[in-house]
Amino acid sequence: FVQGMFEYDITSKLSTKVNLKYAFDYTRYVNNDDKLIHVDNIYKQREGYISWANKYSILSNWDVSVAYDYQWNGLSEYTSVFRNTHWISAATAFSIKNCLKVQVAALATIVDEEARERENAPNKKKVTPAIFLSYKPIRKADFIIRAFYKHSYRMPTFNDLYYTDMGNAYLRPETAKQYNLGFLYDIDRKGHTFSFFRIGADIYYNRVKDKIVAYPKGQQFRWTMLNLGEVDIRGIDAQTMAIFRLPYKIELTTKLQYTYQEAIDITNPADNYYRDQIPYIPWHSGSAIAMLSWKGWNLNYSFIYVGYRYNQQENIRYNYTQPWYTSDVSLIKTFKIKRTHLKASVEVNNLLSQDYDVILNYPMPKRNYRFGISVEL
């Protein structure tokens, strides 16, 4: 892919920004199993994107913005599908005495889709509002209470709609009403060994209509896509971070994250799985990360844990899926040659070479290695 950005301050109060992007993806699926129908499908997906955003400062503490985004997607070879998506947004943000910040926004989404070999997915139009609040009750302390309400709208992707023989061109968009309340507290102690500490937590509630989910059909690459009529989601996210300045200019950063989530299907009280946890969503998950930094070198360790869950809609013993956890290690070196920035990395994933399935009957690789080099001009 290739992308670019242009930003310009027209006046001291008015600024504009333009983003451009073009991407191309090539996927080939071949099935030579003589017991099944021979399959050799090629998918070529192209994406063009342009965004134009403008911001005007009415006062030093009051901004308004208007933006237009356009995205073109094309899928060809095995099937020919084209989608034009337009987003028009307007937002305003203001602060009161540097302790209360408010942002209000509205987003209009317009989708026009054409499929040449099969029925078109219906065109869509939707307007979704959002409001974000941030309050700092103590001026001298970095303690923030935050809350938001957001109405979101998610279109099915081409993968959801067309990539499989069982694709559903009439898969409905997913809509959600999201409520969130949380806090963030920072302690900055420059010059000390224990130089920074952060703790935060959020409680949230989402009511999702036509939630898009995928079930593996037993053959890799192929999934059954469907909508769950109504899903009730509530949970807690908590995280901490600490930074230590050690001798010899070594910096140690540690992060802990924990999530509790209940996501239950409340579509129809007559269903056997009514108020059961939806497939592959664990109640408990978390991660721990440690990073050592020294003179452009970074040594990272991460531990990820995902609790038990169910692989089908009914929460019965037969559908129980065990928890899994894994450890990864990476070593990264960044350096600069004149104006060119380079980064070299070595990763060891699944360090303990454990057997685990994220999706039932789809075993993940044992210990594996990855090497990478990136160049930024």
Please describe what each predicted stretch is.
Residues 98-100, 196-207, 227-313, 341-343, ...:
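Gram-negative outer-membrane beta-barrel transporters
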Residues 209, 305-312, 328-377:
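C-terminal beta-signal and adjacent terminal beta-strands/loops
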Residues 37, 61-140:
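Signature of Gram-negative outer-membrane beta-barrel scaffolds
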Residues 136-138, 144-148, 154, 174-234, ...:
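Membrane-embedded beta-barrel scaffold of Gram-negative outer-membrane proteins
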Residues 28-37, 75-83, 114-122, 157-164, ...:
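Outer-membrane beta-barrel translocator domains and adjoining extracellular loop/strand segments
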Residues 9-15, 57-61, 97-101, 137-143, ...:
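Short loop/turn motifs that connect adjacent beta-strands in outer-membrane beta-barrel proteins
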Residues 22-28, 70-76, 106-114, 149-155, ...:
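Transmembrane beta-strands of outer-membrane beta-barrel pores
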